[in-house]
């Protein structure tokens, strides 16, 4: 377990916005502290020294905004992570500091926590994957003990199943897919397909080895043709996108008596060099979407043209990182996991922007909801400031609600996307063409539906050969029903590379950011 913690820390240690407790993120025990005094409370907080309890167990009460409502888990310091909803809209989540599952009933706003009698005493594990099965059971992963767990909602009993591994393994995301359970083994470098219909503790399984040695295997998504898409990547060195034809493979196995190579049923696509940490992946309307946790970007892949398109988020608000010492020069949002909703929009969590975002590919719009709770231990925060991160590591979509967990604030929360947005954004033109060295202006209109103060512009652009500027640099106020036109200047440098690029234009208040993408074409 210690070896695994070190390996994972190497990959994820730089994902934190600051160096504060960076290596602790996926370890099973808290990091060494100068003050190791532990005041026993008889609660899960006892797994942390007194000096680290505010950092890992929560720094304040549950909060709300117009769009977000949080709920505090009754048991302190549970470190909630993987989350899912059942068919009745109940919310289920795994507690990494207790080994329990918990249920939240949105109708009564009540929690029920289910003791896990076979969980090791004082055990801790990152539980990244959870899904609900039609038979009323919940399946979830456990990286510390290389396990897959089944919880029956009928008899409220847990069953632990050893995860098939050779050497290091880290069962991460999990999906119930028809009659099988699919899991990515992050450090074991494979995708595993389990048959859950067996009653014993040793389930039949198929392991799909990854084609890149020394890499990790990221999240996966399944398209309408039952192809499995996933990533292999090497930390800070890039990687590949993989398509596995599982139907073709299984059909061949059924009719062929010899030995088949699973790798004969995969296609490989090189990831763009800008995409270094493709954690999350989703399929929507035939397109593949990837979340890059090393940047502020989401990438779209078109399987027909085999082209990638980069979509950038807004910059994190200063309330998420503080920058009281001035050490943070270029804050990034770090999109982590990504899932489609029923409308084909892409929902993703922005880890270091403390936000849940919705990208609409049809309207090319982006809405980012700020989560109100912030733990100052995870930012460069001044004393007594409203600053930091709640560490939103997972979410679940149910109708127009997005439920999420706050790993270091001991809360769950919900974004209500049915609530009307306070303003709209319209671009005068969605397309701009430039030759290298040229500048052009583009205008967009902000249409407020209510009084708005402390409004600021969003001018996001991930390319060092493009510059997007405006003469509006300070925050401003908007009156309801009075549209405001904003003009920006887009400049291509002399060495700009020909191609099509997306920039993000919009506005933000503290609770929500609303933007639209414009396409900039650099001509030869």
Predicted regions and their residues:
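Blade-level signature of beta-propeller repeat domains, shared across WD40, Kelch, NHL, RCC1
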Residues: 382-422
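Blade/loop signatures of beta-propeller domains
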Residues: 37-67
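Secretory targeting signatures
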Residues: 1-40, 505, 524
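Conserved beta-strand positions in repeat-built beta-propeller and related beta-rich domains
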Residues: 91-97, 140-144, 183-188, 228-236, ...
């Amino acid at each position: 377990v210690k070896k695994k913690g070190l390996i994972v820390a190497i990959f994820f240690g730089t994902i934190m916005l600051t160096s504060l407790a960076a290596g602790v993120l996926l370890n099973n025990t808290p990091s060494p502290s100068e003050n190791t005094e532990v005041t026993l409370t008889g609660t899960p907080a006892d797994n942390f020294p007194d000096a680290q309890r505010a950092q890992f167990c929560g720094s304040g009460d549950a909060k709300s905004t117009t769009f977000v409502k949080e709920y505090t888990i009754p048991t302190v310091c549970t470190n909630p992570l993987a989350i899912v909803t059942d068919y009745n809209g109940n919310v289920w989540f795994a507690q990494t500091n207790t080994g329990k599952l918990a249920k939240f009933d949105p109708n009564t706003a009540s929690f029920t926590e289910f003791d896990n009698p076979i969980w090791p005493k004082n055990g801790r594990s990152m539980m990244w994957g959870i899904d609900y099965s039609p038979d009323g059971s919940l399946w979830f992963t456990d990286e510390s003990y290389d396990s897959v767990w089944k919880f029956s909602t009928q008899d409220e009993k847990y069953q632990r199943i050893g995860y098939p591994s050779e050497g290091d393994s880290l069962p991460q995301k999990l999906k119930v897919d028809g009659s099988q359970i699919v899991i990515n083994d992050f450090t074991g470098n494979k995708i595993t397909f389990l048959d859950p219909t067996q009653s014993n503790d040793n389930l039949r399984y198929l392991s799909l080895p990854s084609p890149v040695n020394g890499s990790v295997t990221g999240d996966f998504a399944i398209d309408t043709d039952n192809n499995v898409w996933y990533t292999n990547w090497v930390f800070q060195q890039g990687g590949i996108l993989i398509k596995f034809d599982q139907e073709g493979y299984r059909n061949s196995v059924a009719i062929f008596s010899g030995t088949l190579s699973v790798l004969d049923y995969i296609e490989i696509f090189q990831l763009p060099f800008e995409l270094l940490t493709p954690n999350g992946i989703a399929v929507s309307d035939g397109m593949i979407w990837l979340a890059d946790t090393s940047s502020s970007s989401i990438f779209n892949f078109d399987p027909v043209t085999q082209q990638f398109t980069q979509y950038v988020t807004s910059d994190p608000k200063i309330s998420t990182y503080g920058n009281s010492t001035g050490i943070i020069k270029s804050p990034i949002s770090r999109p982590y996991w990504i899932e489609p909703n029923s409308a084909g929009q892409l929902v993703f969590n922005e880890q270091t922007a403390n936000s849940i975002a919705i990208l609409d590919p049809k309207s090319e719009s982006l809405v980012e909801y700020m989560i109100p709770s912030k733990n100052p231990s995870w930012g460069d925060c001044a004393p007594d400031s409203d600053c930091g991160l709640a560490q939103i590591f997972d979410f679940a979509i149910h109708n127009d609600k997005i439920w999420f967990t706050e790993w270091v604030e001991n809360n769950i929360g919900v974004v209500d996307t049915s609530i009307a947005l306070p303003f709209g954004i319209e671009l005068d033109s969605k397309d701009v063409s430039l030759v290298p060295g040229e500048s052009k202006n583009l205008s967009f209109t902000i249409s407020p539906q209510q009084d708005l103060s402390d409004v600021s512009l969003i001018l996001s652009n991930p390319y060092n050969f493009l510059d997007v500027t405006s003469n509006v640099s300070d925050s401003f106020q908007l009156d309801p029903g009075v549209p405001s036109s904003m003009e920006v200047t887009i400049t291509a440098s002399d060495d700009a590379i020909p191609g099509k690029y997306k920039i993000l234009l919009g506005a933000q208040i503290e609770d929500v950011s609303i933007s639209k993408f414009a396409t900039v074409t650099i001509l030869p």
